[in-house]
Amino acid sequence: MTKIQYKDYNQNDFLLFPPCIGDFVPENHPVRTVNAILDNLDISEIESTYKGGGTTSYHPRMLLKVIVYAYLTNIYSGRRMASLLEENVFFMWLSGMNRPDFRTINRFRSERLADGRFESIFHQVVELLHDEGLISLDVQYIDGTKIESVANKYTFVWKGSVEKNKEKLLAKVDGVLKEAEEALAEENAAEQPEEITKEDLQQRTDRILEKMDKDGVADRKLRKSVAKVKEESLPKLDEYDKHLEILGDRNSYSKTDPDATFMHMKEDAMNNGQTKPGYNVQISTENQYIVNYDLYWRPTDYGTLIPFLQSFRDKFGFHSSEIVADSGYGSEQNYEFMFANGMTPYVKYNMFHKEMKRKFLKNPFLQANMYYNEDQDYYVCPMGQHMEHTADRKTVSDLGYVSHTSVYSAADCSRCPLRGMCYTGRRDRRSMEVNHRANSYRSAAKALLTSERGLMHRSNRPIEPEACFGNIKFNHGFKRFRLRSTRKTKVEWGLVSLAHNLRKYVAYKAKSKHKQAQSMALVAEKPAMKSAV
């Protein structure tokens, strides 16, 4: 039998010249790209958070590289990052053999990178992509998704419940105090203010207890009820006020993550429409690179567009010339802002697709299909009756935006043979409300969306931000935040967005090198072919 030969294997061998750890990192490995890019970024804002003195600190650039590369490789846990610094050669090389523990990594991520400091890093990388011609920043494809908070789904506080319970408790306390005042024959017992406030109840409670202690009271049960008001009810009112202060304009929040709002998520395993604490994440993309991001508490998208566009301007100093978004952003207020600031809105509105259908276009009873005399301000119904301008109304949205609508009414529809097809109201004449300003914005948006460039943007939109969200959520497993508060979750989403951009950039560089190598090979083949001939 032939002897089997094995390669030399000795774990206890010493090397005369130990290899450099960089020798184990391939030249075209993504970790080298991350290292090269982050080496050229300005991190002075992060360095400003260090006070100096005391023991030596881990270098912020090293910690930044480790965390960014960890997110690029789908590692989101600080403990796992610390473990890889001892086990993985790429992390060892990137950290220069430094081994910060998970507390140092987590503290750097949640504190040093917060308050806009990481946004500065992200902005510099976007500028790099722009300088290389990968993005122009002239167009933004905008979309949003909801990401769950780390908070438990059963930690909710609802504004409606708080207000209702507070009102009930105020009335209950007022009743107890009135009974006590009557028992003590107080002169001002019937002269209480119409609006009951916690401060008034506090003063009345202290006064009643003081008088009871001074004069004595036969009804011990009443004395106990007033004491309970001071010990339990008034602190409970303070708790309700604290809830309302945290809620602000929101309808809900989570006790374990007060910045998170309860929202309906796309992933609903029980299929019962249950709300969960989360954040509405907004991104804008170009060529599938994320160029801007932000987090909002509003579950709907239309209220986030204006602050999101303003955040882009604050970072880059200008507005993009073209904005592309779906119908969730197509409100009158948003159109007005975009047109006023020189942006071209390729933004759908909620009736856009319905208006394109034959059934809609062939329906003469719809306001959009009726003849409108702009000079004399009246509509003409299918039977030829004039619908005159009879009133004006003003509505205020939850964002404080004021819309003006005009009411148009027919003179008499009681004997109209088309009434059953026209409307089903009980009144003898049809009325309709028209927002002319909103209609003009929608008409302009429709013309843009149906143009050649609009069709191009509409076909690109589903493969721009939606593809980024799908890649991040399903290919890289980021579906839930690990940190609490808007301040920290914004850093976390920024890291996810930067990792997404770097993955694309690494792939682009690899593809460019491959094409360059193929071109050089073709050039080298041509002289050889000529000499052979």
List PLM regions with ranges.
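Hydrophobic alpha-helical membrane-insertion signals
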Residues: 1-32
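A ubiquitous short alpha-helical element
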Residues: 3-6, 50-54, 453-456
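Short secondary-structure transition/capping motifs
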Residues: 23, 55-59, 70, 74, ...
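Basic, short loop/linker segments at the boundary and entry of helix-turn-helix/winged-helix-like folds
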Residues: 25-68
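Generic alpha-helical segment signature
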Residues: 14, 27, 39, 59, ...
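Catalytic micro-motifs at enzyme active sites that drive phosphoryl/nucleotidyl and oxygen chemistry
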Residues: 53, 92-96, 127
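Anion-binding and metal-coordination hotspots
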Residues: 8, 67, 74-87, 98-533
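Short helix-loop boundary/capping segments at the starts of domains
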Residues: 36-47, 72-75, 87-94
